[in-house]
Amino acid sequence: MNLPLQQHGELPRAARSAARGGSDRSGHAPGVLRIAFGIVSLFAGGGLQRNCLAIARILRRRGHEVVIFTSRLADPLPSDVAIEVLPNRAWTNHRRNLRFAADLAEATESRFDLVVGFDKLSGLDVLYCADASIAARSGWRRLTPRYRALRALEAACFAAGADTRVIALSPSQIEGYRRAWGTEPQRVALLPPNIERERRHPQHRLDGTRERRRAALGLKAEDWCWLAIGRQPRTKGFDRAIAALPAFPTARLFVVGLAASEPAAGPVFKLARSLQVEDRVKFLGYADEEIPALMAAADLLIHPARNETTGTVILEAVVNGLPVVTTAVCGYAAHVRDADAGVVVPEPFAQARLLAALGEARDHRRASEWSANGMRYGERPELYSG
């Protein structure tokens, strides 16, 4: 992974000094940066959280010292990266973010050369930005305390004249922030697509893995297996996928990243029951390491998200030969078009358009073409360079 803001000319002053071998604010070895990462919630299974941990490990391998600060540690995580929890008693998410920003500033003062945020926070040297601009939203939500709090944190990073350098993940994301804030182009760097090579296993569709995993899932030969991945049901459009099930009697939906026992799964099950398709929906919980094999077992990645800056699972599906049906709001939907590996449902979203896309994906010959196209697309080295 190439970190685009590591050039000395773009680092904050103390970090440039340390990187050149001069003195720095924490007094450690010349050439070594002491870097603080800030992320509000740290848990297994989240894409942002996985990227945070991966980047921390890369920087550690390069000899730098990294400490991850978080307000909430939801799962046991590997001990190879230092993690400090800053207790936070806020009752709402937006107040939690505000409190965490203040706590992070206090905890890192004079201790670190570089403070990197994985959420929009005040006082950051660098922001790894994984979501869209809240300032661009319209309607009644702009009147809420939540909106005002999150907008203030966004302004601290993106308003014209701010000092924070930004790592962005898609061109459309950058454009959205520039329209909202007039963010200076020289403060923003675009991170190329990046998927881990070890998550690409197109051979699993041909070497018997597909058949073994389908049998383990209880799938019959005639079952049309849809795979959905994520922890935020509404954001990822799980309800849209379930609403499509009645139109396709042989379809079965498997959800990775969310367990049936979690509160967030409740509304999804309620919708499935109301449509009498609950027997065709199964939650597999957190199964990140199994995703390549599950992609081999599946016939389709269904990802009708409402909001998705990138959508790494989209690109992972493409390179693993799994046809994709997704929405145009997803940053990585462009790879589905470029590879000719599925269907991108245009905006504004309509359920009828999703049903039409699924009808196209049901054609076995077309789906086979998409699968082969995705496997070829996955041979491009630039997909693994971010």
How does the language model describe each region?
Residues 50-54, 224-247, 263-266:
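A conserved mid-protein helix/loop that constitutes part of the nucleotide-sugar donor-binding site
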Residues 147-167, 174-175, 181:
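Membrane-proximal helix-turn-helix segments that form the acceptor-binding/catalytic region
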